[in-house]
Amino acid sequence: MLLKNKKALVTGSSRGIGKAIVEAFLKNGAEVWGLCSKPSAAKDDLEKLASENGVAFHEIYADVGNAEQVTEVVKAALAEAGTFDVLVNNAGITRDGLSFRMKKEDWDDVLRINLTSVFLISQIVSGNMIRAKDKSCSIINMASIVGLHGQGGQVNYAASKGGIIAYSKALAKEVGSRGVLVNAIAPGFIETDMTAVLKDDMKAQWVESLPLKRAGKPEDIANAALFLASDLSTYITGQVIGVDGGMGA
């Protein structure tokens, strides 16, 4: 078990990539706090999986876009856990549209939920991590291939994910000497609820453009997160790990 005796906080844990990360962590011996906006359909299954692996799963609730609310909930979870060895900032939304038509509220919502929440949650958790003794801790931030290369119709999303990449690199330089690793994962075209709404012909075009000729699965991202959360990656920090089927090649 790669994460035996570790405690992890995962945001956006109720579905898709977040749920897959929680599952991978539980299977590898971590006790996990999953943060989502409301009680999820996955809760019972995740609690069962945790029990089968001799660990615990705790589902907690907050709107990550509400600074006061998410701060209160994360601080309470941290008090319960004592410390988090791993933080995965995965929660995110899209509000797509051409830039010249985009409403300011759509820009603000995406930046607040996708980027500002990463700062707020990491600030709380990293402050505790740097006081940990004789062990390394890991912060894993979910970026996107769009944050590296841009995408028309997603200027707000691209800005938020590009911001996550820059933030991760800067924070890695701040906390590395205290044993805290900070990395970002940049998924490509992954089969999730977020991509399921795309038209079939658009999805086919995306897949055809990939060297691997297939869409990724949430488990592909979860495997990368598992590696970064484990002691297999203790000399990796400030990096962006592309999990994109070759999209960024």
Predicted regions located by residue number:
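C-terminal substrate-recognition "lid" of short-chain dehydrogenase/reductases
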Residues: L2, R214-V243, G248
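Alpha-helical segment proximal to the catalytic Tyr-Lys
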Residues: G127, K173-S177, T234
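Residue(s) in the substrate-gating loop at a strand-loop-helix junction
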Residues: S144
